[in-house]
Each structure stands twice: as C-alpha cells, then as structure tokens.
Amino acid sequence: MSGWHHRHILDLAAFSREDYAAVLDLAERFRSLPVTGARKLPALQGRLVATLFFEPSTRTRSSFELAAKRLSADVQSFSPSSSSLSKGESVLDTARTYVAMGADVLVVRHRSTGVPQQLAEDLESAGERTVVLNGGDGLHSHPSQGLLDLHTLARHFAPQHPMPEALQGRRIVIVGDILHSRVARSNLWALTACGADVVLCGPPSLVPDAFRAFVEAPPPGQSADPVPQRGSVRVERRLERALPGADAVMTLRLQKERMTQQLLTGLERYHRDFGLSHERLSLCGQPVPVLHPGPVNRGVEMTGALLDDPSICLVEEQVRNGVPIRMALLYLMAAAESAAESTLVSISS
C-alpha cells in the first residue's frame, strides 16, 4: 500500500482510479475472511478506533465498529445523549478528549458540513497523529457509502474482477433527493472518476440544474483532465426519459429532516412520478439492479415488492459490502505497513 497518500479521508473529490482500485482490492480480500475460516485479523491490534456520531445511525456506525473489531482494534463509541455535550462541551473538545485517551482513528458523523475537516485541521495544527474518517457530514460527503456503492456495482458487473474499470461506460441513474444527499455527492465523484455516466432524475426542487456541472471542475490539486475517460453527468426530470439504457438504478431517501422549506407537493405524488416499481424498471430495456443507501421509505422511493425482490434489489448486498469496505479504509489509514501488510499478503496467497 505504498502508493496510499490520504492521511485523512474527508471526501472522494481527490481520489484517483488507483485509490479506488486499492480500496476495492483490499475489500475483496477482506470479504474472503469468512471463507478461509478467519473471523478476525490482528492488523489493528492495539489501535483504538473511536466512533463519534453526533447524528443517529444504524448501518454506518455498526458497520464501522464491526470492521474495526474484525481488524482486532479496540472500539470506543460516543453517544451524544450521555456525553458532556449536554453540559455545553464543544464538538472540538469532545474530539480532543478521545485523542487524549489515545484514539488512533476518529470516525466522525455530524449534521453540519465541514465538521470532520475542522477536526482534522485542528489535529494537524496540534501535531497529533490521530486521523479522521468522515462518517457523513451535512450535505457534503459520505465517502464510505460512496465506496461501498461502487464496490457493490463493480461486483455486480464483474464478479470475477470487481475493480473500477467495471464501471467504464456504464449508465447509472440516481433518482430522488439529490439536493440534500451527501451520498449522491460521494457517488457522483466515485462513479464519474471510474468512467460511469450518471443520470440524475427528480423534480427541480430536489435536483437543481447546478448538478449538471458537478464534475466539470477538476478535484483539488489535480489537472483539468485528471482522469482519462471520466464519466459525464446529466439531469432528467422524468423517469421515462432517465431509465432507458440504464445499467443500474439508485434511488435515494427523501430527507425531510434536512428540508428547510416545502419542496414537495406530497409523498403520494412523488411516488407516482419518481417511485420505482417492477413495471417502471422495464423501461430500462434490460434487467438492472436497484440500490438504496437506506433507510428505505417503503411505498415512496420504491414499492415494497421491489424492495423484497433479491433478484433485483441490492440493498442487503450494500450492507454486506459495508464491512469489508470500511475494514479497507481503516487498514489503509492506520496500518498500511509492517505486520498488517504481511498479514494481508498471506490471506491473498
């Protein structure tokens, strides 16, 4: 892993195809652990991973904690309801407390954009060795979700070699509340960097035209043409125009808790116009998988029948892929050398 250069993982904007390949390759090797009979690796033994989730979470938090434990790390969970935040302690001071306890990795989720980056900058200024992994911040980014979605699609398209090139030239349709979705933004960076063409579909109030130019500007520190054959982004207002020719469809939850004004006329109308069903998917012209980052609102983003159809819906596969992807990220950040490297080599041989 000598080519890995991301000390903190705050978003996917500056990830190269080589970075995506490194994560997916490790995740594939970690997926093989149950097959080999090994439930845990000593890769992060003696390391402390602290999950600082200032927002509710089921999948992401549990997945990160299980990933850390499977790498033999110690895990310390933070709960806002029983913390000193209720006594006026700041987020920064809370994070510093865990650093003082010896945390090697802080996995941070917060409703405000930029909090993980602020913590990373504070740690750098203080000369601390602790690294920050963004578990989701505001509307900005959810890098591990973008990576596990990429992994899920790569495994679907190329199960024998699920690497970034499996997405080259694929058409991925993302439907729903793009405006309030950090998942959508992370998927846009990951999918287009790997050569997929993305179609965003939803009403103007939830999919502003500004998203057409989402990937036109080069990522920070890269040239104007950083990735060969980078994918495109286009916006459609009707599912009937978005779905034909699709290779996969991702639908997103309506994030009513983040909506500051009335952006929808009603859930029934939304489902009528943008809800997925078996019948609607026939417009793709071929069998396609359906993804959703969860939690799913049955009968809104998709029908219950579609959600319960394992031949089409990959929601549970996304959850399964979350653990090896997060194992890969924790490994790359905290133990990309010495004994952990030799452990991985022995597994892959």
From Swiss-Prot:
By its UniProt entry, which Gene3D superfamilies does this protein fall under?
Answer: Aspartate/ornithine carbamoyltransferase (3.40.50.1370)
Query: Does the entry feature the keyword Metal-binding, yes or no?
Result: no
Any one Pfam family here would be: OTCace_N
Any idea which positions bind L-aspartate?
A: K87, R182, R253
Catalytic reaction annotation: carbamoyl phosphate + L-aspartate = N-carbamoyl-L-aspartate + phosphate + H(+)
This protein's name: Aspartate carbamoyltransferase catalytic subunit
The pathway this protein participates in, as annotated, is:
Pyrimidine metabolism; UMP biosynthesis via de novo pathway; (S)-dihydroorotate from bicarbonate: step 2/3
UniProt-listed Enzyme Commission number(s): 2.1.3.2
Q: How does it assemble?
A: Heterododecamer (2C3:3R2) of six catalytic PyrB chains organized as two trimers (C3), and six regulatory PyrI chains organized as three dimers (R2).
Alphabetically sorted, this entry's keywords are: Pyrimidine biosynthesis, Transferase
GO molecular function terms attached to this record:
amino acid binding; aspartate carbamoyltransferase activity
Q: Which GO terms describe its biological process?
A: 'de novo' pyrimidine nucleobase biosynthetic process; 'de novo' UMP biosynthetic process; amino acid metabolic process
Q: Which residues bind carbamoyl phosphate?
A: R59, T60, R109, H142, Q145, G294, P295
Q: What class of enzyme is it?
A: transferase
Q: What does this protein do?
A: Catalyzes the condensation of carbamoyl phosphate and aspartate to form carbamoyl aspartate and inorganic phosphate, the committed step in the de novo pyrimidine nucleotide biosynthesis pathway.
Keyword presence, Cell inner membrane: no
Q: Name one GO cellular component term.
A: cytosol
